[in-house]
Amino acid sequence: MRIAHIAPPWISIPPRNYGGTEHVIATLVEEQIAQGHDVTLFAPEDAKTSATQIAFFPRSLFACDVPWQAHLKAYYHLHKSVDYLKEHVQDFDILHTHLSSAADMYLFPLTAALPLPQVTTLHGQFPFDRITTEWQGDADRYYMEWLSRIPLVAISEHARRFEQEKFPLNFIDVVYHGVDLKDFAPPSTAPEDFFLWVGRLTFEKGAHLAIEAARKAGVPLILAGILDQNIPDVQRYFQERIEPEIDGRQITYIGPVSPHERNDLLHRARGLLNPILWEEPFGMVMIEAMAAGCPVIAFRRGAAEEIIASGKVGFLVNNVAEMVESMQKIDTIDRTLVRRSIETHFSAQIMAENYTRVYKQAIRMKRNTKLFVPLAPARDQTSAGNLAEDRVLQ
């Protein structure tokens, strides 16, 4: 299949440290090439890819210190990519776009008129940095009109349900993210005596709760993550809730880490703490940890119930007290079983195969109708709490 991916222009592909969407795109593209597809990637020149690459910027925007608010820069990349596709539409079977920030919404009117079949993966929580109750007015209705014509892929059952309660989004399927298992060493039989927290240092990611749990459990905790210096609320959170707790002994902050460094930490850690305070659409760090054989203790929010079979490959908890209790039981988890759950359900191979299925569905839809219309989900809507449980038992 001849596949075109338009990536967001903000972060390099793959990312050097933080960048969940970009890491997923990089993994998917490489696996699709390995499976014999002809892949073209529209991304800045600093991408490292085996795909045919078409670039309109020499470097990703963040590498040039361009802030999120500079939407016109992103629009230029998206517009030029779509212009190229209009001129070479006969060279492609499917267009796959990736929605991860408000700037990416320029894609809606740009791609809706393309004769090329397409799908868009919603990587974040719509409408991103917009407040849902303020999603109104002529401009918003304009984008929503176009959005209703684009077939969307959700990254979890929870994300699909959560978004459709707010907006008439046109989800045609759910495809879970996957990881390249070659990037992860076999599970350790003797992990070191520390717990790990990885992510963006924002309130909703819950680093302060991981610290509280580690203090109460009396165990060492390593914090690894990126601190956005350009957002005052994030700076205040770090200065007031995180920095005073860092002592270099029990609580250590090591800053952002590369994917290789992160995977090594996950391989060595007793467990990953993930006390999220928002309805996270997926949670890449959980499957990255599990690919390394590292069990995850996560708050029962977002898609966590679809990933973690509690008591078998990790623990789902409701508060810090339950997290502390689970930390004391972490060594009862079989790290080999943790890894196996990723091999059988969250690998790059499975992700790419599932997208091939979705592409074929989108191509059929394009042939049969002028506008995309919502379809009933293909899979049985088993409750999310049973999804991870069923996978472990298979």
Outline where the language-model segments fall.
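Catalytic cores of nucleotide-sugar-dependent glycosyltransferases that transfer UDP/GDP/TDP-activated
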Residues: 1-394
